[in-house]
Amino acid sequence: MTAPWQKSFLAFAGPGIDHPSDALRVTDSEAADILSTLAAQTWSAPIPARLARQPGYAICHACDGFNTALFGPDGIVGFYAGSYLWIAGAHRGKGLSTPLILAAAERRGGSILPPGIVLQGYTPAGLAAHRKAHHQAILEATERVIPGRVRRPGAIDFVQLRLAGATR
């Protein structure tokens, strides 16, 4: 299985990166419909260490299919379901999108595109979140191979030059 850091950003996120649009935002009513479907699914045990810096949250994969959910104290507060990424308003801005995106990508073979999907759209904010997640995956991989390297000035430039396709 390929890890997210082993893919170019284009392979990680798909060709939809070229045309972000706010029209692609998941509304709260759309999210409510998806949440009702997700509530009926059986979930895996929480993924260890993915949310180490965000206590009170857990990420789990659906036992069937490729959905990934972010659980808070009161149940699902975010998801990557199909090609839809959403986090409830009260939980945004807490650094939760990066671990959710990376967990979904790991489940899907290194890309966030679910099986059978070749094009996925993004809002500008969603595209930025996916870029941040992809960079984070590369930095984590680099830190495992070259401890201390990512803490040096210009680390992301080094990573982009040395590892396959951190840019488009």
Report residues per predicted region.
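Non-catalytic substrate-recognition and accessory regions of acyl/acetyltransferase enzymes
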Residues: 1-91, 102-117, 121-127, 135-168
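Glycine-rich phosphate-binding loop
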Residues: 94-99
